[in-house]
Curated annotation (Swiss-Prot):
One of its GO terms (cellular component) is cytoplasm. Belongs to the AB hydrolase superfamily. MetX family. The active site is at residues 158, 323, 356. It catalyses: L-homoserine + acetyl-CoA = O-acetyl-L-homoserine + CoA. Disulfide bonds: none annotated. One of its GO terms (molecular function) is homoserine O-acetyltransferase activity. This is Homoserine O-acetyltransferase. The lineage of its organism: Bacteria, Bacillati, Bacillota, Clostridia, Eubacteriales. Substrate binds at residues 227, 357. Keywords: Acyltransferase, Amino-acid biosynthesis, Cytoplasm, Methionine biosynthesis, Transferase. Pathway: Amino-acid biosynthesis; L-methionine biosynthesis via de novo pathway; O-acetyl-L-homoserine from L-homoserine: step 1/1. Gene3D superfamilies: 1.10.1740.110, alpha/beta hydrolase.
């Protein structure tokens, strides 16, 4: 007999106003945002106690569409469909899974492309700098509106892992556990360096127009180039040998191509650059990469070590063997610092060749550890 077809998980974007003139969002910088909307999606149902929710935090160019489809005929599901859904590790029959687009983003949440209520035109570079802590504080307001009393867990990869750690330090009693994947409580110097080169590609594009390029093509070449460099940091040498090797693009003979695309790996990078330009705002790219640079769990908390002592949640830190952007010593350090202050933390390493993007491309490698961790948290909650 043929297996029954798997039902399509349908979802929709929702919007919540989390800051108003009467209740502004005060940022770490001291600046205020008086009108903030977050775009979010919900999968599964929140239980009456309000304690079965899992917050998924997305990476740099992600959005709220973590899983499912908006329509049955959508060609592609959300960006982490392997992880979220009925019977999956983040089981929507069991948990209420919530994902929001971050503050400063461009996929429905307030960011530099949003209209500045003071001027009636897009903020552009008048938008204040935001930090990961600011993102988390905005998310906390959203969860309050949704009736979430206590999170079962916060999970995310890359920038999402930074958010998970910030959640545990800012709101120590609001979750039972966190699962930061390929991230850290502060960005390392090489990561900041990668981000600065990407930003310069955007800032030096003649189409940038001081950040007020809305209504024009914008800095398309700069954003595409930034994405090309970013993609290099998301993969590994091993994965590039496997996927591309030194293979020429099509029938091209590299000896006769001059500086045109000659190799498959070059073609891939150009393709990724073009794809991002179609769906992402260059200003958001600037703001979110800077938020990663500014990430420092210890800021205002005495020291980096003291910040980890604030964490009461259980921690499952996931490293990726081949990660160039967030090397595994960073996740091991997180575990050591939490344990040093008496907290509970464990480390799991993905033995994947796919580099930083392995949490998206090789999720089955960590499905069982995550499923087990969540079930243990649930058992503790019900004990």
């Amino acid at each position: 007999m043929n297996a029954a077809p798997v039902p399509i998980l349908l979802t929709q974007r929702r919007y919540a106003r989390v800051a108003t003139p009467e209740n502004p969002l005060v940022l770490e910088s001291g600046q205020r945002l008086t009108d903030v909307t977050l775009c979010y999606e919900v999968f599964g149902r929140l239980n009456p106690a309000g304690d079965n929710a899992i917050l998924v935090c997305h990476a740099l160019t992600g959005d709220s569409h973590v899983a499912g489809r908006y329509r049955p005929d959508d060609p592609k599901p959300g960006w982490w469909d392997d992880a979220v859904g009925p019977g999956k590790a983040l089981d929507t029959d069991r948990y209420c899974v919530i994902c929001s687009n971050v503050l400063g983003g461009c996929q429905g949440s307030t960011g530099p492309s949003s209209v500045n209520p003071a001027t009636g035109r897009p903020y552009g570079l008048d938008f204040p700098l935001v930090t990961v802590r600011d993102m988390v504080r905005a998310q906390a307001r959203l969860l309050d509106l949704l009736g979430v009393r206590r999170l079962l867990a916060v999970i995310g990869g890359s920038l999402g892992a930074m958010q998970a750690l910030e959640w545990a330090a800012t709101y120590p009693d609001r979750m039972r556990g966190i699962i930061p994947i390929g991230g850290a409580g502060r960005f390392h110097p090489q990561g900041i360096a990668f981000n600065e080169v990407q930003r310069q590609a955007i800032l030096n594009d003649p189409g940038f127009l001081g950040g007020q390029y809305y209504g024009t093509p914008g800095p398309v070449r700069g954003l595409a180039t930034a994405r090309m460099l970013g993609m290099i940091t998301y993969r590994s040498d091993e994965s590039m040998w496997t996927q591309f090797g030194r293979n020429p693009q099509g029938e091209a003979n590299p000896l006769h191509q001059g500086f045109a695309v000659a190799y498959q790996v070059e073609s891939y990078l150009h393709y990724q650059g073009r794809k991002l330009v179609e769906r992402f705002d260059a200003n958001s790219y600037l703001y979110l990469t800077r938020a990663m640079d500014l990430m420092d769990l210890g800021r205002g908390r005495g020291s980096y070590e003291e910040a980890h002592a604030r964490i009461q949640a259980r921690v499952l830190a996931v490293g990726i063997r081949s990660d160039l952007l967030f090397p595994t010593y960073l996740q091991r350090e997180t575990v050591e610092l939490v344990r040093a202050s008496g907290g509970r933390a464990e480390y799991v390493e993905m033995d994947s060749p796919w580099g930083h993007d392995a949490f998206l491309l090789d999720f089955p490698l960590i499905e069982e550890p995550i499923r087990r961790f969540l079930q243990e948290l649930e058992a503790e909650e019900n004990a």
